[in-house]
Amino acid sequence: IAHNICSSDGVRKGSIHSIEALSRTLLKLVNQTENSYSLNMGLFRVNLSDSHLTCTDGKGKIPIDGMITKNDYDLVRKTATAMSTPTNKLKLHTINKKFIINETFVVDDPIEMEAEVLESKVHIVTVSSASVRNIENCLKQSNLEVDDIVLNPIAKSNALLSQDDKDNGVCLID
């Protein structure tokens, strides 16, 4: 793993204030890192902090006739997230809370289970669409490609906690 440090030109108090300045900074940082470590960096995963983030819960329910398929799983999650999102917001993450089979059994993974009804409860994270577009514009102006944008606390938990830690309820305090 490589690392490098440079000034955060174009960013003030965690917000982008100049796309041009930040684009130059990103390009300089990538070039320094590639040269220092003999790397060719391609896709970038960006962790986002957003003071305008909101979290809501969603719930979806669909009828099932037999075994639950991946398509059923996708459809019930889509139904659970079918809330209207303001034009200035973007759904960044949908986090499964639980699946309920036949209004009785709570399961983590319903695929291939038999059911008449499948319900999904999810946690939906929305962020400022302008913040995301600004990040994408900075990277594009620097000829850098975005692979994914992840909310900062989720990125940290993915980097630091194992699946067992998460399953056992470990709390990461930032």
Where would I find each of the regions flagged by the language model?
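Nucleotide/phosphate-binding catalytic cleft detector across ATP-hydrolyzing
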Residues: 1-43, 48-173
